[in-house]
Regions:
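Conserved signature/switch motifs of ABC ATPase nucleotide-binding domains
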Residues: 190-193, 211, 243
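Conserved ABC ATPase signature
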Residues: 191-195, 199-201
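ABC ATPase NBD coupling module
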Residues: 122-138, 168-169, 240-242
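Helix-to-loop junction immediately C-terminal to a conserved catalytic motif
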Residues: 105
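Conserved ABC transporter NBD signature motif
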Residues: 113-121
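Short coil-to-helix segment of the ABC ATPase nucleotide-binding domain corresponding to the Q-loop/switch region
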Residues: 149-158
Length: 257
């Protein structure tokens, strides 16, 4: 199911904010306060935490204020995204889209309210656990951020080794799989400068898929691309979503949707 969300401050009421959907209205009212269960012992606490995490949607933001460099840009944000959904986060530059994504990857703190992604409580997550969180999500930015002195294959092997992969045969198999997903299976030997802008962004998408993420987040992934190439990149995201991956794309290119 595809949703389009506009995160501008004007679309968020001051009280009990809901998110205005261009094609439908998604309403996430404030939850009634529930007194936490009293548990004793480390195992019991962990079991309760796991139970709570399992009950949450893939992405869940409840009454959270979104900041940019200590400046409040979006008050009382509520957002619920279920597993397998495809959501566009639409807004002009500076409207808070990127700040929402930074919060979701634990680059920004949760100052109030409640925020969860892929079973992790962003309000309480410890720094040492952030790398584990990010292995459960794929992240694609506007800038390609590829290693220019390495081939496409080498860029992907580098990421696999950085995230704990060791078996060469398994790594080669996974690289082939993700490059096939983005229709670049014949380009593994090429260097980034030998690829078009659209092809480089496809490599970044393939890199984001290496660890089979539950969630794929993209921040202005077509910002540097022409309209035709942008449309092709959006189609790649849709194909990924059809395989069951939750996709959240922040973009100002609402005409491309």
């Amino acid at each position: 199911m595809e949703k389009e969300i506009n995160p501008t401050a004007e679309s968020l009421p001051e009280e009990n904010a809901s998110v205005e959907n261009i094609s439908e209205k998604i309403s996430t009212p404030q939850e009634a306060e529930v007194k936490p269960k009293k548990v004793r012992g480390r195992k019991a606490r962990k079991a309760l935490e796991a139970e709570i995490a399992a009950s949450k949607p893939t992405i869940y933001i409840n009454n959270v204020d979104i900041f940019q460099r200590n400046l409040l840009v979006l008050p009382h944000v509520n957002l619920t995204i279920q597993q397998g959904e495809f959501v566009y986060l639409i807004g002009k530059t500076g409207s808070g889209k990127s700040s929402i994504l930074k919060l979701l990857i634990a680059d920004e703190k949760v100052h109030n309210g409640e925020a969860w992604i892929a079973g992790y409580n962003l309000a309480t997550i410890k720094k040492r656990h952030v790398p584990y969180l990010r292995r459960k999500m794929g992240i694609v930015f506007q800038d390609y951020q590829l290693l220019q002195d390495k081939t496409v294959d080498e860029n992907l092997f580098f990421m696999l080794r950085a995230t704990g992969w060791k078996n060469r045969a398994e790594m080669e198999k996974r690289v082939t799989q993700v490059l096939t997903m983005v229709d670049l299976h014949t380009k593994g030997h090429k260097y980034p400068h030998q690829l078009s802008g659209g092809e480089q962004q496809r490599v970044c998408i393939a890199r984001a898929l290496l660890n089979d993420p539950a969630v794929l987040l993209a921040d202005e992934p077509t910002g540097n691309l022409d309209p035709i190439t942008s449309e092709e990149i959006f189609q790649v995201f849709h194909e990924i979503n059809k395989r069951g991956t939750t996709v959240l794309i922040a973009t100002h290119h609402f005409l491309m949707i």
